[in-house]
Amino acid sequence: MRVQKPKGTVDILPDQSSSWQKVEETARNFFNRANYREIRTPSFENYEIFSRSSGDSSEIVEKQMYDFNDKGGRHIALRPEGTAGVVRAYVEDKMYAPEVVKPFNVFYMESTFRYERPQAGRQREFHQIGVESFGSSNPLADVQTIMMGHDLLAELGVKNYQLHINTLGNEQVRKDYHDALVNYFTPVKDELSEDSQRRLRDNPLRILDSKDERDKKFLPDAPKIREFLDDDTKNNFESILKMLDQLGIDYVIDDDLVRGLDYYTGVIFEFMVEDKSLWESATTILGGGRYDHLVEEFNGPATPAVGFGIGEERLMLVLEKQNPALFESNSIDFFIANIGEGTAQKAIEITRSLRKQGFEADFDVNQKKLKAQFKKADRDHAKYVITLGEKELENGVLNIKRLSDGKTIDLSLEDINDMSKVMGELKD
């Protein structure tokens, strides 16, 4: 048997997971400060949840979704993105009920799955951090969502990101734009890729998202959606841009931005990072927008909504270069080195007491020689080593050594139970 992880998956080992934890803890604290609460949904759903939300003609449904029939004959899919499952939960668990405060604001951190070619920052199992806000059609909801994405990236230490923004208008705007795209692409249909020939029939907007060179040559002269905006949609978009200006959030109006999912309506946006050492062109690390009809699509009441998702793998690649402090090795506060008859029991008691007080503490369960224990303390990046031998146990006095400069102090065994008394002296 070949023991090997599946293609497109990675092991996040202990020396790497600490940086992931820091990013997720920063994001979790950020969302809580914004009055968003965590939601957790299943990693698999009924297939229709994703096919209806993403769109049958989307690349996700056509090529990337992991789906299968389970032992009960149910058509199941692993989630390819986070929004659909949250919307399903919103409807099924009746979060639209009047007694639930609106807007209903949630965030999530979860694994997602897409069958695509693995490359830098893109795996077949990847991690997504996202937010969703249900219940407000006010442009302030769009602005807050964009502002949160902008400020979270800044708080994480991303430096050279740029906001790209566009609007997909209302239903009439999208219908008029749909017809214009059909009229534009139909004369060159035979020159399009096979996928885009099908998209021309099902959803010509998807052609604008094509990466195929046969399609890309026609995109610069394709109609732009803002040519079809009515006054209401135009005013909505301009009010959002004005608020972003007042917040000092720079942006680029990107006519080619359409996002890869069919459920988007109104304003859509992406935060992009350009780093030639990672990717040939600017790459999206956060994307989102408004989706005002998806709750209805899932048989819920008409509910406006807006949100975004972050690809955590891509984010970590950027942060590794731009915020290396996140990737520094973790340290522990205390390592208890013990040697001699009868010291092991006291060592574990001291470790337990320190942990209860909120300190990070460890000891050597293998009872190696003292020199080896000090080496382990150094590898664990311990700040202090407490030495416990037969003499210390007999006298009830411990020696604490600060590894950064070798400073030592003595304290009684009783002091261990309230280290707040001695931490000031240890830090001097």
Curated annotation (Swiss-Prot):
Is the keyword Cytoplasm assigned to this protein? yes
Kindly give the Pfam families that the UniProt entry links to this protein: HGTP_anticodon, tRNA-synt_His
Q: Where are the transmembrane segments?
A: none
| EC id | 6.1.1.21
Q: Name one GO molecular function term.
A: catalytic activity, acting on a protein
The places in or outside the cell where this protein is found are: Cytoplasm
Catalysed reaction, written as an equation: tRNA(His) + L-histidine + ATP = L-histidyl-tRNA(His) + AMP + diphosphate + H(+)
Per the annotation, which location comes first and is thus the protein's main one?
cytoplasm
User: What InterPro entries does the database record attribute to this sequence?
Assistant: aa-tRNA-synth_II, aa-tRNA-synth_II/BPL/LPL, Anticodon-bd, Anticodon-bd_dom_sf, His-tRNA-ligase, HisRS-like_core, HisRS/HisZ, HisRS_anticodon
Q: Which family does it belong to?
A: Belongs to the class-II aminoacyl-tRNA synthetase family.
How does this polypeptide assemble, per the annotation? Answer: Homodimer.
**PANTHER family, alphabetized:** HISTIDINE--TRNA LIGASE, MITOCHONDRIAL-RELATED, HISTIDYL-TRNA SYNTHETASE
Q: Check the record and name the NCBIfam families matching this protein.
A: hisS
Q: What is this protein called?
A: Histidine--tRNA ligase
Gene for this chain = hisS
